[in-house]
Amino acid sequence: MTCISNPSEKLSSSVWKTNGVLLLVLLILATAIRVWLLCHTEVTSRDSIGFERYAWELEHKKWKQVLRSNLHHPLYPLTVLAMSVPVRQIVGGSDLVVMQASAQLASGLAGILLVIPMFFLGKELFDRRVGFWAAAIFQCLPVGARVMSDALSESVFLLISTIALLLALRAFRTGSMTGFVGCGCCAGLAYLTRPEGILIAVAVAVALVGRRLFVQRQKVWTEIASQLAGLIAATALVAGPYIAIIQGFSNKTTTRDLLKSEIRQSRSELTATDETRNKHGSLSVFVPCFIRGPMLSAFGFRLSDFGIGISNFAIWWPDGKVSDLPGHLWWSLYALASELSKGFFYVAWIPALIGLFTYRARLRFWSGEMVLLVLCLLQCLALLRVAMVAGYVADRHVLIIVLGGLYWAVAAVFFLVERIRKGASWFRTLCPRAALLFLALVLVALPKTLEPLHANRAGHHAVGLWLAEHITPADEIDDPFCWAAHYAGRTFLRETPGASLSCTPCFRYVVHDCRPDHRDRFRKPSAPIGNLVAAGGQVVYHWPEEVHVEEANILLFAVPLTGNK
């Protein structure tokens, strides 16, 4: 008896094999970039120190107390805590080693897995070519690749957000209640990672209502209402317990400030207080990144010609340069546009806008494509508000916009190249294939992408290692930069009574960075050298070690405490 195979089964098998090969290539690419950057990280980001401490507190304290006292949302620290279980068994070592490795692995793994929903989202929006190249380019562009390797919450946030968008797109096409409920659950999880995750649910709700008002006018409201109810209920079910525990929408300083009407105050009005010191008299290294808002949580130098603060990670408010409301608005628009351009590697935003215009007819149906556009617009509005209130815009906050925009950019390039090559113009012989253009963009971006993370902070790492070998638990560390105190082991001190009373405190160690561009925008500036010397302080370590102390970039002073001079 002859067995005749079903052609549709062969076609389905071929499609899945092709998808599998493309996904394998994406996973290998993402893994290679993550591993390279993890192996070439001098220090973790300052925000990651807070996340590591957060995860450590979840392990050692009551969760309700920890959630209320920390400013960041808990899902990424919970992911770090979960990752620390196998890391502790495999790697071992101190809490510093375990938690830092766990934070880097949690962030890196989420960044790798991101290629899967990105591929399928692009496949749903256009085709698998668009999904493949959008995911590949996003992994290779400097801002996204480096943030996803830096032990920050963005990787987990982007992974969950992309899954939510994929579920929303499919739910709009099928009308499935399960899809909207799943999207709501993912929106709640995205909110538990970063507060702007709630915008996903808002974008889906706007698209649902818009479709009823402008497309399906004859459709009864009951179906739309049930889909909205499923979306909102799922979001509330996931996000509600955290909101109830903290008794508010968010503990983040910036998020709370966004709900107020005041424009940001000058940085000169923000001074350090005794809150930056812990019970041992040393700098609380997990506080500075969060307690007074992100305006002071990064470093940078000023372009004196324009009076605008610039750093590797953000654009800062120009103190004293703009005072009126129109000035605030224009500066905020400039800052947002600059960070978006940087996120798109300065060129990819152009085909993204072309793609939006070319495929604008799709938006008339108020479907999944509209969800993506509304989400990007809502994120832009939120970042404008951040710029107006907090006085800064960070590149990592525009990543969800870059992620969504790359689909339109890739689709536009395919459309333009195919149209040119099919035309009768002589230019078609000079027009390269779209894949070659994408490869050229990747090759240009990779050198910047693969630069070591925070290589300019090697000195702080060295100071921290020196402190770890020479200080006693009772000695104080005054470190406005966080890294030296972190690598000295002060991040994970157990706050037990009498823990530091077994030995007598002798010195207050003060980290002083001699580079002016590395001292700007910190919560508490380094004490002037003259004051340290007058207090009896002496330089006990300098970096680089091979140069004379007068030529050193970083000085470590040991100042005798009262009664020990």
Residue ranges and their predicted role:
Residues 27-30, 134-142, 166, 187-191:
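Short helix- or helix-capping micro-motifs
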Residues 15-18, 175-176, 212-229, 352-376, ...:
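Membrane-interface helix-loop-helix junctions at transmembrane boundaries of multi-pass membrane enzymes
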Residues 3, 24-27, 202-206, 228-237, ...:
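Signature aromatic-anchored transmembrane alpha helix within multi-pass, membrane-resident enzymes
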Residues 116-118, 298, 305, 331, ...:
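Hydrophobic, aromatic-rich transmembrane alpha-helices
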Residues 4-12, 123-125, 129, 164-180, ...:
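Membrane-interface transmembrane helices that cradle and orient dolichyl/undecaprenyl
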Residues 35-42, 243-253, 279, 289, ...:
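Catalytic lumenal/periplasmic loop and adjoining terminal transmembrane helix
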Residues 44-46, 72, 143-157:
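Short acidic/glycine- and proline-prone juxtamembrane loop motifs at membrane-interface regions
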